Amino acid sequence: MQLNPSEISELIKSRIQGLEASADVRNQGTVISVTDGIVRIHGLSEVMQGEMLEFPGNTFGLALNLERDSVGAVILGEYEHISEGDVVKTTGRILEVPVGPELLGRVVDALGNPIDGKGPINAKKTDAIEKIAPGVIWRKSVSEPVQTGLKSIDAMVPVGRGQRELIIGDRQCGKTAVAVDTIINQKGKNLFCIYVAIGQKASSIMNVVRKLEETGALEYTIVVAASASESAAMQYLAPYAGCTMGEYFRDRGQDALIVYDDLTKQAWAYRQISLLLRRPPGREAYPGDVFYLHSRLLERAARVSEDYVEKFTNGEVKGKSGSLTALPVIETQAGDVTAFVPTNVISITDGQIFLETDLFNAGIRPAINAGVSVSRVGGAAQTKVVKKLSGGIRTDLAQYRELAAFAQFASDLDEATRKQLERGRRVTELLKQPQYQPLQVWELAVALFAANNGYLDDLEVAQVLPFEKGLRDYLKSKHADLIKRIEDTKELSKDDEALLHTALKDFKKSGAY
């Protein structure tokens, strides 16, 4: 059978007219390869960096590498059922997590799904996990304190609302303990907390959650957990998800505190993803943008102005500034703070609390090295009474450590040096504190007052802590009005100083310690 050209054209025209063409907005591609949770996709020409991709079986992924002829994506969740040739669709959405007060008291994964067995979370709002930090114009200087309840931190390296204070040290030297004590101490202080656990053992995370529950701190805390058994993608995303949950409170004129425990594990997870995506490795095999990984996260912790809050809430909240305070944790190897990730995070943050294994093993806990630890902005936020009383304590302790090292070789020391060493020993003892027992402002003030005015000088070192505890009990029973004044005003007037001198003398005479 032969068709002439006119018949062929008629046939084509009729076929074209009868064609039902519906344009699908979504772009589609095909899986080329799947390895270690990384998928290479061909044909996604319209995809955005960081866009959510839909795989078969209701599985989602994140587009991270946009190359000329393919897209590199990381799978969020299980990937065993994904195979070569599967169809992948773009969603046109960036990854979002649920936010809001409904999350308080709950344990969630990096995507905001509940993992505590307490049922679904009915959050009314979701927000993108990647956001640009507030600009310079919208920020305010740090002026209100975050009371950690730890004598050595509140006196020597104070933390303010909106500050980023790094907790750095080797493994097993009390970094998590400092962070958890800070969360426990926020009870009744109108500060919401987010604890982000990255790459930790599930049992360790459970211990923290149990302790927060026992102390009643879980009711104002959100726990975001990406344990060691979860994929590198989840460990990489968890800090950003937690930060978005904290920003919800910051942007509505409230105060929030976020602990990232720890960012070393996040850097390891990101390094793993980057190497699998075939990005060129740099120093210590980290990718070139590992600094940006942490800087864009920590810059989102800020104190924002009243104008920012009013603009963000469309005038619903007026005259209130909000803050997000960050306590990132970094684990060092053998005390080496000059490694790549520690130096990066030290340069991004507003100070660091340096914990030492030697001090920890010597029974000085929290094991804070006074000479290296610093708070670059927290001094402005310190309460007046603590600022007044803690003036020289950091210098004294740093000098004491230097002298103590020198005194091991010197046999005959002059009187002034001997006095400084004795005072240093007692102050070091005074700053020791058991875990899960944070102190109130008046308790810290009284302890510092006793040390500054020489009331500890004639005590044996072993008597210092019993003396401090006995003094607190004595003041509670005999001078409750003085305690209330210090707590309410956060100041120590001349009259109160005289009263405190009298109380201390009376207590020492009684010998009830």
Swiss-Prot record:
**Gene3D superfamilies registered for this protein in UniProt:** 2.40.30.20, ATP synthase alpha/beta chain, C-terminal domain, P-loop containing nucleotide triphosphate hydrolases
Family according to the record:
Belongs to the ATPase alpha/beta chains family.
Residues carrying the site annotation Required for activity = S373
Q: What class of enzyme is it?
A: translocase
Q: Name one GO molecular function term.
A: ATP binding
User: Per its record, how is this protein called by name?
Assistant: ATP synthase subunit alpha 2
Reaction(s) this enzyme catalyzes, per UniProt: ATP + H2O + 4 H(+)(in) = ADP + phosphate + 5 H(+)(out)
Subunit notes for this chain?
F-type ATPases have 2 components, CF(1) - the catalytic core - and CF(0) - the membrane proton channel. CF(1) has five subunits: alpha(3), beta(3), gamma(1), delta(1), epsilon(1). CF(0) has three main subunits: a(1), b(2) and c(9-12). The alpha and beta chains form an alternating ring which encloses part of the gamma chain. CF(1) is attached to CF(0) by a central stalk formed by the gamma and epsilon chains, while a peripheral stalk is formed by the delta and b chains.
Q: Which PROSITE patterns match?
A: ATPASE_ALPHA_BETA (PS00152)
Q: Which PANTHER family match?
A: ATP SYNTHASE SUBUNIT ALPHA, MITOCHONDRIAL
What keywords does the record list, in alphabetical order? ATP synthesis, ATP-binding, Cell inner membrane, Cell membrane, CF(1), Hydrogen ion transport, Ion transport, Membrane, Nucleotide-binding, Translocase, Transport
Q: Which GO terms describe its cellular component?
A: plasma membrane; proton-transporting ATP synthase complex
Task: Describe the function of this protein.
Answer: Produces ATP from ADP in the presence of a proton gradient across the membrane. The alpha chain is a regulatory subunit.
According to its UniProt entry, this protein's organism is Paraburkholderia xenovorans (strain LB400)
Database matches in InterPro entries: ATP_synth_asu-like_sf, ATP_synth_asu_C, ATP_synth_asu_C_sf, ATP_synth_F1_a_nt-bd_dom, ATP_synth_F1_asu, ATPase_a/bsu_AS, ATPase_F1/V1/A1_a/bsu_N, ATPase_F1/V1/A1_a/bsu_N_sf
Q: Where in the cell is it found?
A: Cell inner membrane
EC number(s) stated in the UniProt entry for this protein:
7.1.2.2
For the ligand (ATP), the binding residues are G169, D170, R171, Q172, C173, G174, K175, T176
What NCBIfam families has UniProt attached to this entry? Answer: atpA, PRK13343.1
* Topological relation to the membrane, as annotated: Peripheral membrane protein
Q: What is its main location?
A: membrane
CDD domains, per the entry: ATP-synt_F1_alpha_C, ATP-synt_F1_alpha_N, F1-ATPase_alpha_CD
